[in-house]
Amino acid sequence: MEIEGTLQDDRPASPKRADDLFDYDFGLDELWQETPNMPNNGAPMQSSARDESGLGLGLDEEVKVTKKRQPVAKLDESRLLSQPGIPKLRRTAKKKLRFKGKGHEFSDAARLLNFYQLWLDDLFPRAKFADGLAIIERLGHSKRLQAMRKEWIDEEKPKVTSENHNDALQASESSGSRSDDPVVAFDGLNMADTKRSRGDIAGDHTSDAEGMHIEDTLISSRQRGLDEGLFMTEDDDAAQQPDNRGAPDDDELDALLKEQELLLMNNASA
């Protein structure tokens, strides 16, 4: 059966069958109308729209291209006061910057300039070292940086604790009480007098032993007077105190002395 099928297929087609194959009713005009009008160079359909927008003058539509520009970094107050700015400079200077001192001034200055140059290069690489220093100097005159500089200076000052403050107050009060005490003031005057007397004695070419002896005698006499005043009885104190109620004035005493002198002179003449 398969052989018969192949034999039937291998048979030549009849003329009627060939006419049926090529006899199809399909219009080529309809096919060309359905397909879009594509140009020969393969340009898209937008070319017609461009021609219409250009009003047939051959001008293409202007295409506006806007580029997003990146913000340019500037060395301003905010950048200088940020963490990579002056705070980093203060923090690293305490840890890394060390000076040798006397005899190494040139090397210390070079080390300081190198330290500043590395810091400024990390902060603002666009500017040179001299230009960056000029910008920082100009920014240093602003009120914001002046206030921050004052705050940094106050932070570096030694802080006064409450205990130290109380000790200072007690010391000032004790010094004031000593100056107000009449006994202490009197002793200070006496010591000044004794020192002055010792200086005078030294000027008179006396020995130090004599000066010490005079000072001891002055101190002993003053102490003896104080002891006698302290241990004096009430009767002696009352006897030494004059009666102010019956005491004459100074003018009356002068008059009495003059009268006494006149009487003596008269008696002598007689």
From Swiss-Prot:
Gene expressing this chain: csm3
One annotated GO molecular function: DNA binding
Subcellular location(s) of the protein: Nucleus
Bias-annotated ranges (Basic and acidic residues): 8-20, 156-166
Start and end residues of each stretch annotated as Disordered: 1-20, 33-61, 156-185, 195-214, 223-253
Its job: Forms a fork protection complex (FPC) with tof1 and which is required for chromosome segregation during meiosis and DNA damage repair. FPC coordinates leading and lagging strand synthesis and moves with the replication fork. FPC stabilizes replication forks in a configuration that is recognized by replication checkpoint sensors.
Chief localization: nucleus
Record-linked PANTHER family: TIMELESS INTERACTING-RELATED (PTHR13220), TIMELESS-INTERACTING PROTEIN (PTHR13220:SF11)
Subunit structure: Component of the fork protection complex (FPC) consisting of tof1 and csm3.
Protein's UniProt name: Chromosome segregation in meiosis protein 3
Pfam families on file: Swi3
Gene Ontology biological process terms in this record: DNA repair; DNA replication checkpoint signaling; meiotic cell cycle; replication fork arrest; replication fork processing
Alphabetically ordered keywords of this record: Cell cycle, DNA damage, DNA repair, DNA replication inhibitor, Meiosis, Nucleus
The keyword Nucleus belongs to this UniProt entry's keyword annotation: yes
Residues annotated as transmembrane: none
